[in-house]
Curated annotation (Swiss-Prot):
Subcellular location: Cell inner membrane; Cytoplasm
Cofactor: Zn(2+)
Listed Gene3D superfamilies: Helical scaffold and wing domains of SecA (1.10.3060.10), P-loop containing nucleotide triphosphate hydrolases (3.40.50.300), SecA, preprotein cross-linking domain (3.90.1440.10)
GO molecular function terms listed in the Swiss-Prot or TrEMBL record: ATP binding; metal ion binding; protein-exporting ATPase activity
Organism: Neisseria gonorrhoeae (strain ATCC 700825 / FA 1090)
Protein name per UniProt: Protein translocase subunit SecA
Example GO BP: protein transport by the Sec complex
Gene name per UniProt: secA
Binding, ATP: 87, 105-109, 507
Source species taxonomy: Bacteria, Pseudomonadati, Pseudomonadota, Betaproteobacteria, Neisseriales
């Protein structure tokens, strides 16, 4: 009550922000005539002027009015589009690191140019993030002429791009790409073994298009770079036969072997189910008699069994995945798009492959991972645009510290949002949907039908075919035709059936998208220039009449075939209609068989239905029902927010560890001299080993000197008689022994370094350290996954799972770091340097030299080899010998950065130059 009164008196936070921004809009508008009077050359020169002013100490905020005015005028000249006042507000919101909520059709792509241009002037790079490669390429292509006119370069990151091209794209002032590509490049950059192989610069400023889709819908899906793990493919096939023998329970307390919790998307095996499964696996010979699935030795069997149960019970064909070219391809539940190349983890993908009888590919082991939540928080400044952010404003603020500002529309919204119609059964609902479509089609009103799954879109398509209504289907299976179908969805009488419309990225123009049609004609090589001009002229003349006819028919009509779990997705579907003041309408058709009503609103809604008791085919429209459904959606949104928050809380633990590892790794990559770090690592490793067998402040009787001597010999090749030291000097203690051992190791290491050269040893140290960190980090990630999967069981012991996870993860990380240091010290001190004479090799013609990029030899393999063997195997695979002296005898000098004459493709300093 008091809050509402305060808002009426002082205005809301959003109103106050808009009032401030409008003052800046007035300053920008005051510069418009001045900018229009400039020649093209003078307007272009403004970019260099702004950069100089920034170098002289001015801030981006200080030059904002002028920069925005320049960008608007350049856009008018180059693109033929002038920014509206509300678009200027949107640009300022983005520059301030906030989220701009703008309705569909309000020109978000053009709005971004203002903030992007201003921030690109700082020279630190700007990333424009989109949801797919098509939109990244399209938006970059549209806006590149504007940025080029203003003296800025544009790059595009798309999948399958080579590293060199990626480096060039990131070096540009403005880089377009998808959230996946930006995230994966960050992970790959932290796996390189040469700093010059990195592609990204510092993460400075990002503008995220469809920010709710990327930062919320995909927040629970981590980006993972993985390699194949050793796995038994046959076990998935065997386990696939088990679920049909188990009985599904109707309720959690019912009789049966397992229960499916659809809300939590989990399968729970009952005690009876465990016993039944153990009997089946014992009969198959996978489980020993009287053995238990709970035992540590059988954890893999349990893992495979649960994956098979989830595959059979929770993941359904044409809803969660499709089969394409003999492969399981995941369907994005939020957008309906195919996610080629993505695979479910934890053996689930293999279990689904076994269920569908397609080729089973090996399970992957995580090499590096990060969530979008933690990746995008790495940017110095982050902003975003979307048509629907207000319902998730609290989450944006609490997780990303992003405030949402609702930008007013340029013209008032004319769309009519009609009441939901609710039916008893899905059959009645779809009959009503077809009837509504038929009526719209008769009067020439275009219709967009939104479904939540491929299965439902194909069902609607079959019903429309039966009714003789021509239509287009837009789902994951029709991805290639997507833009064309959406562009023409506003034509007279057009019927378009689509899975979730989130992130489609193409406006539906009433009367059809004229630009798409004219572009298609211009691209048609079978037509002459005269024919193209004639067809384009005819199109332009006929378009206005068609546009007017659609306007008279009521504009685009939206039909939702069920409510999504999130109100935001429903609003995105509605938002396709009524763009830029156009007329339009929307209505949702629901049934009590819909998942949302069945799972979250059934009891109260069913009671209301029984009281109203309509006849078959008669819809219910009641405010109480609508409120009940919205309450169910809010409940689901709250549950999903809690799940995303929980994912973040757990990932924050791994994220802090990731920062430490990546920071240390980067220091090793970029440091010219890592001698001090190596000395510290050797010292720590020896000290830790001595402390293990000679604990500080302990009695001499507690020391285990023989084992210490054995470990020193095995780990560091130190043959020391410590017992004789103790006999010779009664006053000696653990610290004295550490100092003697460290001195001995340092002397031996200095001798090795002198033998091979300081630079060669530094390169070798760097490679060993990076491989050790990567290998141990990979194993640590797997251990963290296992810890995470079972940590919830601690709650049964009255312990807080999150606190337990943090505590154990910290201990594991300490062990990881100590293990890395010990491994590095052990390996490098154990390496033996031998110098054997090497014979000359016959000189190869230049044309036969091949550049090959082979994997480095495994560290474990290096341990048992001499240095000469190592060089022969790693740098001269064919076993031939090579002599730098032989070349010098023929008067040929090989410089350090020249290709090595042995034909390995490596630089001489990285190959046989190490022996020279």
């Amino acid at each position: 009550m008091l809050t509402n009164i305060a808002k009426k008196i002082f205005g809301s936070r959003n109103d106050r922000l808009l009032k401030q921004y409008r003052k800046s809009v007035a300053r920008i508008n005051a510069l418009e005539e001045q900018m229009q009077a400039l020649s093209d050359a003078d307007l272009q020169a403004k970019t260099a002027e702004f950069k100089q002013r920034l170098a002289d100490g001015q801030t981006l905020d200080g030059i904002l009015p002028e920069a925005f005015a320049v960008c608007r005028e350049a856009s008018r000249r180059v693109l033929g589009m002038r920014h509206f006042d509300v678009q200027l507000i949107g640009g300022m919101v983005l520059h301030d690191g906030k989220i701009a909520e703008m309705r569909t059709g309000e020109g978000k792509t053009l709005v971004a140019t203002l903030a992007v241009y201003l921030n690109a002037l700082a020279g630190k790079g700007v990333h424009v993030v989109t949801v797919n490669d098509y939109l990244a390429s399209r938006d970059a292509g549209i806006m590149e002429p504007l940025y080029n006119f203003l003296g800025l370069t544009v790059g595009v990151i798309i999948s399958d791009m080579q590293p060199f091209d990626r480096q060039n794209a990131y070096a540009a002032d403005i880089t377009y790409g998808t959230n996946n590509e930006f995230g994966f490049d960050y992970l790959r950059d932290n796996m390189v073994t040469d700093q010059y192989d990195k592609v990204q610069r510092e993460l400075n400023f990002a503008v995220v298009d469809e920010v709710d889709s990327i930062l919320i819908d995909e927040a629970r899906t981590p980006l993972i770079i993985s390699g194949q793990a050793d796995d038994n493919i046959q076990l998935y096939q065997i386990m696939n036969t088990v679920p049909p023998h188990l009985v599904r329970q109707e309720t959690e307390e019912g009789e049966g072997d397992y229960w499916v919790d659809e809300k939590a998307h989990q399968v729970i095996l009952s005690e009876t189910g465990h016993e039944h499964a153990e009997q089946i696996l014992t009969q198959m010979g996978l489980l020993a008699e009287n053995d238990s699935l709970y035992s540590a030795a059988n954890i893999s069997l349990m893992h495979h069994l649960m994956a098979a149960l989830r595959a059979h019970s929770l993941f359904h064909k044409d809803q969660h995945y499709v089969i394409q070219d003999g492969e399981i391809v995941i369907v994005d539940e939020f957008t309906g798009r195919l996610m080629s190349g993505r695979r479910w983890s934890e053996g689930l993908h293999q279990a689904v492959e076994a269920k569908e009888g397609v080729e089973i590919k090996r399970e992957n082991q995580t090499l590096a991972s990060i969530t979008f939540q933690n990746y995008f928080r790495l940017y110095t400044k982050l902003s975003g645009m979307t048509g629907t952010a207000d319902t998730e404003a609290f989450e944006f603020q609490s997780i990303y510290n992003l405030e949402t500002v609702i930008i007013p529309t340029n013209r008032p919204v004319q769309r009519k949002d009609l009441n939901d119609q609710i039916f008893r059964s899905a059959e009645e609902k779809f009959e009503a949907v077809v009837k509504d479509i038929e009526e719209c089609h008769k009067r020439g009103q275009p219709v967009l039908v939104g479904t939540t799954s491929i299965e439902n879109s194909e069902l609607v398509s079959r019903l429309l075919q039966k009714a003789g209504l021509p239509h287009n289907v837009l789902n994951a299976k029709e991805h290639e035709r997507e833009a064309l179908i959406v562009a023409q969805a506003g034509k007279v009488g057009a019927i378009t059936v689509a899975t979730n419309m989130a992130g489609r990225g193409t406006d539906i123009v009433l009367g059809g998208n004229l630009k798409h049609q004219t572009d298609a004609i211009r691209a048609d090589e079978t037509l002459s220039d005269e024919e193209k001009q004639a067809q384009i002229a005819a199109l332009e003349n006929g378009w206005q009449a068609e546009h007017d006819k659609v306007m008279e028919a009521g504009g685009l009509h939206i039909i939702g075939t069920e409510r999504h779990e999130s109100r935001r997705i429903d609003n995105q579907l509605r938002g396709r209609s009524g763009r830029q003041g156009d007329p339009g309408s929307s209505r949702f058709y629901l049934s009590f068989e819909d998942p949302l009503l069945r799972l979250f609103a059934l009891d109260r809604a069913a009671a209301i239905l029984n009281r109203l008791a309509p006849e078959r085919g008669v819809a219910i429209e009641h405010n109480l029902l609508t409120r009940q459904i919205e309450g169910a959606q809010r409940k689901v949104e709250g549950r999903n927010f809690d799940m995303r928050k929980q994912v973040l809380e757990y990932d924050d633990v791994a994220n802090e560890q990731r920062k430490v590892i990546y920071s240390q790794r980067n220091e090793i990559l970029t440091s010219k001299d890592i001698g001090d770090l190596m000395q510290e690592i050797r010292s720590d490793a020896v000290s830790d080993l001595v402390d293990t067998y000679m604990p500080p402040d302990s009695m001499e009787e507690q020391w285990d000197i023989p084992t210490l001597e054995n470990r020193l010999a095995a780990e560091f090749r130190l043959q020391e008689d410590i017992q004789s030291w103790l006999k010779a000097d009664n006053a000696i203690d653990g610290q004295d022994i550490k100092e003697r051992l460290i001195e001995r190791i340092e002397n031996e290491y200095a001798a090795k370094t002198e033998l091979v050269g300081k630079q060669a040893m530094a390169d070798f140290e760097r490679n060993v350290m990076l491989q050790a960190i990567d290998n141990q980090w990979r194993e640590h990630l797997a251990a963290m996954d296992y810890l995470r999967q079972g940590i919830h069981l601690r709650s049964y012991a009255q312990k807080n799972p999150k606190q337990e996870y943090k505590r154990e993860a910290f201990t594991m990380f300490q062990d990881l770091w100590n293990g890395i240091k010990f491994h590095i010290a052990s390996l490098l001190t154990s390496v033996q340097i031998e110098q054997n004479p090497v014979a000359a090799v016959e000189e190869q013609p230049v044309g036969n030299i091949q550049s090959i990029h082979s994997e480095s030899p495994d560290i474990e393999e290096l341990l048992g080899q001499s240095q000469t063997d190592l060089v022969t195997e790693a740098f001269n695979p064919d076993g031939t010998d090579f002599s730098p002296e032989a070349l010098e005898a023929r008067g040929q000098i090989v410089h350090r950065n020249d290709p090595c004459p042995c034909g390995s493709g490596l630089k001489y300093k990285q190959c046989h130059g190490k022996l020279a």
